Amino acid sequence: MTAAELSARAEFARRLARDAGALAQRYFRREIDFVAEAKSPQDFVSAADHAVEAFIRERLQKAFPADAVLGEEGGGALGRNLWVVDPIDGTINFVHGVRYWCIAIGFITAGERRIGVIYDPSLDELFWATKGESAWCDETRIHVSPRDRLDHALVCAGYVPRHPLEEHLALKRRLHEAGVAVKDMGAGALMLAHVAAGRYDAFLEPHMHPWDASAGLLLVEEAGGRIHPYPGPGGLVAGGPVIAAAPGIFAALERLTLAR
């Protein structure tokens, strides 16, 4: 793929994320009524998720018909040039009226993350990165925090019910014993964007799907952060664990997270 082709996709993805966010806001404000259903405990899906993903898919397929699209709600096939889409990351917040959710769009070429866009409609903040071109929030370059001590760190630790609860609680105990302040804001992609912007010092989750993780991981890397290898041995569709942090605490946090 040429630099011009990649640049065109990056610009398109930024516009698309804003447009998708505007549509999602209509549902969030109940200008369009919707019903939410639980796929599993604390894992919600709503008509808003389906509508926003359909909107994104249609725009991508019209603009780049040869590209593949993999979405949280609609699935899809893999391809050399692949878009990964989470139409509303943080659906549990969205359906409860909590303003911590986002639109996440990533682009992967031959297995390499090349574009990441995360839009927070509630604050009208657009986080974006293209491989090798730094990370940005709107027109401002962003960087991970300079934190170098765990006992000064603010870390987000997400949890998914399919992961053993005992392991999650043991990890939180280790983090607290190390002096870490621990939060879970309920939207992994947006938490990754906030790590890239230096607002949080790190983000951990035992498992993330590619549509949740891809855009944010590129943001963190381009903002000077470090990440644990992703995806796991099962490949892209299977996803894997996520550790993303400021470089000054990454090694210590990785050891703490992977300890048993």
Give the label of every model feature segment.
Residues 1-88, 255:
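N-terminal subdomain of lithium-sensitive/metallo-dependent phosphomonoesterases centered on the IMPase/IPPase/PAP
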Residues 108-112, 122, 131-134, 140, ...:
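Short loop segments at secondary-structure junctions
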Residues 58, 79-136:
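DPxDG-like acidic metal-binding loop motif
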Residues 50, 73, 87-90, 94, ...:
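Generic detector of well-ordered alpha-helical packing
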Residues 13, 17-20, 116, 216, ...:
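Small-residue (primarily alanine) positions within well-ordered alpha-helices
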